[in-house]
Amino acid sequence: MRKIVHVDMDAFYASVEQRDDPGLRGKPVVVAWRGARSVVCAASYEARTFGIRSAMPAVRAERLCPNAIFVPPDFVRYKAVSRQVREIFHRHTDLVEPLSLDEAYLDVTQAKTGMQLATEIAQLIRTQIREETELTASAGIAPNKFLAKIASDWRKPDGQFVIAPSRIDAFLLPLKVNRIPGVGKVMDGKLAALGIVTVADLRLRPLEELQAHFGSFGQSLYRRARGIDERPVEPDQDVQSVSSEDTFSEDLALDALDTHILRLAEKTWLATRRTERIGRTVVLKLKTSNFRILTRSCTPEQPPVSQEALAQIALALTRRVELPAQTRYRLVGVGLSGFSNVEEGAVQGQLFGEIPQAE
């Protein structure tokens, strides 16, 4: 039986800002650029009490909390702290799979330290993070990645939760299906329309029925309802692509997608900055109302050097969609692929918006 730990830093970007500026502590902090098309990168727990969440439009966050303190993101600083945290992970196991700067899976089945109890390993990791970075992290401990990720949310912030193999059914069955990763508002609504509200409801449905309604995702739902997840922890995978998607509550015409594409381009650009790598190929993904998936891509001579350039290329790709004008779309996505490392110096400054200081 594997021992998997999912570690998730608490309000990471906002917590770094509060750590480094004592004047921000105890106040609603929103990490975001101001602007009509900006989205929230992170919100402190004080800001979350007003309903502010990551990926929310910044203008909405400002309406929810007019007194919120907006801080522009500093990904160079966040990356440096992330390296500190990752070094702590590697003291315990080489099987570390980063998901982003602020979370990772660890397989501690055979920990380097010789410690046997995954709960004790997780506690020690969280203690080391607190002592060495002055930040807090939460952890979930379980026999697989799916369960560990759910568990890490259970005692946030600054806590941990274990799902023992003997307790999987007792934990899973009462859960609302929207706690399953990948089940968002739209999917939750579709499941509810079928009378599926809890994981217990989901488990009663045969695989064939779920596949008929949800295609390949139906198989994933079937397995997750049984707590099954055989995916291994894959150490330090290089990023091959970054993308953001929106699924709509109502199907939209192609010409109604522009505002969504602009917002998704910003989310994708922010995610790309976190990797400190260059994506050369722009990808537009569409799903029609009858679940047909289309992708269009473009690899310009020079990679997009700004969020605006990425957005313009993605918008241009909509003109390469050759479907009847009456076609309606239920999903749009914007992505970057074909990654390479950012050059040091001037190129990095050009790509990631750093303005050289006059000497």
Swiss-Prot record:
Residues flagged as site, Substrate discrimination: 13
Protein name, entry field: DNA polymerase IV
Residue ranges annotated for the UmuC domain, each copy included: 4-184
Catalyzed chemical reaction(s): DNA(n) + a 2'-deoxyribonucleoside 5'-triphosphate = DNA(n+1) + diphosphate
Entry-linked SUPFAM superfamilies: DNA/RNA polymerases (SSF56672), Lesion bypass DNA polymerase (Y-family), little finger domain (SSF100879)
UniProt gene name: dinB
Cited function: Poorly processive, error-prone DNA polymerase involved in untargeted mutagenesis. Copies undamaged DNA at stalled replication forks, which arise in vivo from mismatched or misaligned primer ends. These misaligned primers can be extended by PolIV. Exhibits no 3'-5' exonuclease (proofreading) activity. May be involved in translesional synthesis, in conjunction with the beta clamp from PolIII.
Bound cofactor: record note: Binds 2 magnesium ions per subunit.
Classification lineage: Bacteria, Pseudomonadati, Pseudomonadota, Gammaproteobacteria, Lysobacterales
Main location: cytoplasm
Subunit architecture: Monomer.
UniProt cross-references to InterPro entries, sorted A to Z: DNA/RNA_pol_sf, DNA_pol_Y-fam_lit_finger_sf, DNA_pol_Y-fam_little_finger, DNA_polymerase-Y, DNApol_IV, IMS_HHH_1, Rev_trsase/Diguanyl_cyclase, UmuC
Family per record: Belongs to the DNA polymerase type-Y family.
Chain coiled-coil ranges: none
Record-annotated active site: 103
Catalytic activity, EC: 2.7.7.7
Localisation per UniProt entry: Cytoplasm
Cofactor(s) listed: Mg(2+)
GO molecular function, one term: DNA-directed DNA polymerase activity
GO BP annotation list: DNA-templated DNA replication; error-prone translesion synthesis; SOS response
Binding site for Mg(2+): 8, 102
Keyword Ribosomal protein attached: no
Gene3D superfamilies assigned to the protein according to its UniProt record, in alphabetical order: 3.30.70.270, 3.40.1170.60, 5' to 3' exonuclease, C-terminal subdomain (1.10.150.20), DNA polymerase, Y-family, little finger domain (3.30.1490.100)
Any one cellular-component term (Gene Ontology): cytosol
Record's keyword terms, sorted: Cytoplasm, DNA damage, DNA repair, DNA replication, DNA-binding, DNA-directed DNA polymerase, Magnesium, Metal-binding, Mutator protein, Nucleotidyltransferase, Transferase
